[in-house]
Amino acid sequence: MRIDLFDVKDFIEINKLQEVTSPVLFQRGDIPHPDGLVSNRIFGTTVQSRKNTFAYINLYGHFFHPHVYKAIKRMFRNMEKIISGEQYYIINNKGILELNENGETGIEFIYDNWEKINWEKTSDSGMRNERIDMLKNFKKDEIFMQYLIVIPPFYRDIKSTSSGGETGELNKFYTNAIRYASLLKDRDMFSFQLYQTNSNMQNLIVDIYDYFKNKLEKKTGMLRKYLLGKNVDYCSRTVITAPRFHANKPTEMQTNFKYASIPISQICSLCYPFVVKWVKDFFEREIFSFKNSKLVYDPMTNKSVECELDNPESIFTDKYIKKMIDGYVKDPECRFNKIEVPIKNSNKKLFLKFGGRRLNQSKEELSNIAYRPMTYTDILYMAAVDVTKDKHCIITRYPVNDEFGLFINKIHVVSTTTTEPIMCNDKVYQWYPVIDFNVSPEKMATKFIDSVQFSNSYLKGLTGDYDGDQTTVKIVFTQEANAECEAKMNSKQFFINAKGSFIRVTSNEGIQTIYTLTKNPKTTDRVLSTADALQFIKMKPENITFEFLVDTFGNTVDISNGVSTNAKKSNYNTTDIIDIKVPYNGFKGKTTLGRLIYNKIVFDQSGLSNVFGYINKEINDDVNSGIEQQIANYTKEDKITVDQLYNYIDYRDWVGLQLHAVITTSFTSNTLKRPPEVTKLKNELIKKYKKEIEEGDPNIANLIDKELVKKTEEILDDDIGMDLYKSGARGSMGNNFKNMYLFRGAVMNRSTGKYEILENSLLDGLDKKNISVHSNTILEGAYPKAVGTADSGYLTKQISSGLQTEVLGEYGSDCGTKKTLDITIPKKPEDYLYRYIVENGKLVCLTPDVIGNYVGKTVKMRSPMYCIDKKCICNKCAGDNFYKLDKKNIGLVAVTMGGVLLNLNMKKFHNNVVKIQNIDVNDMLI
């Protein structure tokens, strides 16, 4: 967008604007002054005219346009002193302003001699030269202004006061301008007063310019917020918070992969029209229909009494409903407010009665709830559950780089931090809020969940985490749109990205738990008896509860009385060995108890054991990624259903995240320090390579890194604190552990272009000589994060612009190109699945069943780089992967490359280890 200066005088003449001459806003009696800033004569009396009618103020002098004035001050700082009359100047033969006591001063001096002034360009200042070009390109009447435009009064704040009226900042600016102009009109003042008034007027014009500029610019400005931004009704912004894992079974989780948990307060905003309608119907059904005889709650007797209501329609109005909903959203203290009902011929305070039945998790009736008054929370919770039962929500995190930047979920309503199953009006509410009238108002907010929660498995697609990231939530209203949402949730594309990889992965804690469950046993581990083994083998997967897992693997204590009592050691370990003698899911032989439990919970219950059989291996992050890549492949081949994927994700996350605190160990005393043997080795290596270290040899630093890490891994191999690193859940020995406890290593000094070796680890602290070297490590991390973010963002826009029109041809299409790429298929060939190669003159599709035959071989692969179809990319050049995922607009997928680059730049902030690689020059040539 380009903005030019315009001739103010032309604007006044074309629009026939009237002049504002009085600084007085209101006359006596709050009547607008006829010549003032809110005049009915000048601006009219209708809303339309007061919204569209401009006016002007005659400045009675020449003043710089504020944008020009700012530019000149950056080139010639003393211009301000000329306008204020503090310094005198002459214009020499070259047109340059020179300081001279016998010269002239004031804004009129500059105006009269404007054509004589020559602004010198320089060879080393691009911005200065651009500003000079601007001054030369604009006319004199555009650079200087004699009139100030007054915007319509509709956009200026005005409020009446006892003294006549008070206005906002903008009206004060205009009022001051009129006063300065009246002084300049008469010019009945000393010269120094004239110059100072001119200076005040010029600065005031700049203040008005800055006022509007600040309203328009940057992220919160009107252009971005209202013109370029998108404001959606019934929408909310919320911080991403972790879901709660307290379910005894996976099927009892309130927040799972299919359902997001949205708090009552946000439902009231997101579904406002539906909630209002529900509450109105509730009052009609439960109050208005029984006003002659209604059972209500009497707090004095703690019983229900039958009463005649006194005109309840006049109380429970639309205004009452709006006030209740708005108060609930904005003021947590009112959430347990009781609903008082008007009683005929009585001043007693009686309340609408709530009656329901507590249920256990199997929905069997336990007891009647003691009669209590109904609260705002009761009504709005039931309303929220009812209005969202057939709706979906769309949760988005910006920026959206691909289709996984947002996701669709069904809705569960969350309320208080503690809930219970309740049956009310013949409907079961599994997570009904616990109403506690003993909670003080100031602590009420702590008893409610007021942020949206959703499955951890969506975080990778959103590129989000729990450090304050925010999402936008919108609930879909129409039946047609909800049907589309349901179809999207039940498609393969919801789980698999354009690369063909499984995108719904678990978090770091989940990986560590799965590793602990499945890690390799030691020769010293216990072998379970046949009776114990059969007990676990025959156990039904659906009977494995969290209570059972805690009893089996957990070390527990009773802290209910504030002290630790009844300490109980676990009965079994995850590495206890079981000998399966009768084939179980096709497996026969020795396994561990943890692996058996993992298979039963995750694969048996989800139905994936029919495809995978029994998985009897240690599962770290790499192995788990391989399993989930197989899941993606089988899904594309229709060997795994979408329902099985939902079950797999929920069961995996339930056991991985809820059991984490029971069986995993992240640190031990040994993994929080450097072993003495490693300290000895470090000193020996530093002494041995003293010369190379002083010379900053990165190869030697890399060698020392590897030696120290290798020695540490040997010493701590049996320490359970190493599970964090071995599992691949978080951190790495070669980066986090090394930098923290072992050896900082090579650091690039950008000033010298050479490496410096930092011998101390972070735990060792810093010597005085190492402070500058350590500072360079901070620079190496911060610079790529700051600059790289901007670069990758711009690259994403370029990629999107250049490739957005690229589409795939029809399935089976072939452009017939003879050109191919020579590709060596790696050990992990997932990136080349479903691509076409040419073998003996024929096309072969690299399906999961076939691609293994080509690992390690160089093949001739068809590529979009060589597609000769002018309208699209043909099927044979693109491969079958995109067709299996129904992605025809393939160019839109390319923007993910910018996201990859962004993540790589961000990663440098956390990992600045210098690595040495051998590069074959031939690999660099195409």
Language-model features: where?
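Conserved core architecture of multi-subunit DNA-directed RNA polymerases
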Residues: M1-I926
